[in-house]
Amino acid sequence: MEGTAVLGGLGARLRLPWREATIRAIREETPSAKTLVLDVPGWPGHAAGQHVDIRLTAEDGYQAQRSYSIASAPGSGELELTVELIDDGEVSPYLTEDALPGDGFELRGPIGGYFVWEPRLPDPLLLVGGGSGVVPLMAMLRHRRATGSTVDARLLLSARTIEDVLYREELEGLAAGSVDVRITLTRGEPPPGWDGFARRIDREMLAEMGPPPAEGPRAYVCGPTPFVEEAARLLVELGHEPARVHTERFGPTGD
């Protein structure tokens, strides 16, 4: 999740302490997105699908706060956030364009108990992401791989262009293994030899991805609010139980 989340549990959130996070390393994922590897003393650990709040404080005391999904798998020994640049944002421009290893900021978390996946869950896994909504879904896939889970896992990712696809090489590796990965591009012409989809996510696409509702899959949908609402609606229309369609949405600020 990248932006202001539409989430509950405000009371529990406010009880979490702010911690000092230091950037240990930075990786470029796309021309507009970077992954920050953080050192956070006292970090209690997290579950796949959770997120954190980040707070920046300017020299004049002005503070800006945004929420970002955790990209790293639980138990990996890393805390990683992938941040996509929002041109008119207050936080993402600093994190993607100005921040350097050794810089620090305040961090609060982990947050969230609804949009999480654990290897003990035996149900097939259907992941649907829009843009940077793939970040918490990647944490789930990384956790699945690290724990040796053999749960049926499928990922459908929507991106504007192939250059906007986060974790592209890693996704190709997962697709060559035990994860069914399909990408749909929504803008411009797809590259030569493209074997994915080239349209917005629709009912036919979701039905093709499966697993069928009769198998009782757990679906996790993350992305901008309109994307999530439409994908969740289509999944329910296809017969998926609403209680098994977990959603995480970006808020209106989009930063």
Task: Cite the ranges covered by each PLM segment.
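Reductase modules of NAD(P)H-dependent flavoproteins
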Residues: 8, 14-17, 152-255
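Ferredoxin-reductase
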Residues: 7-103, 159-161, 185-188
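Short, conserved phosphate/pyrophosphate- and ester-handling motifs at nucleotide-, phospho-/glycolipid
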Residues: 49, 133, 224
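Hydrophobic/small residue at the entry helix of a nucleotide-binding pocket
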Residues: 132-137, 227
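Histidine-anchored nucleotide/phosphate-binding helix
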Residues: 136-146
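A short, basic/flexible loop-to-alpha-helix module at the beginning of a structural domain
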Residues: 110-121
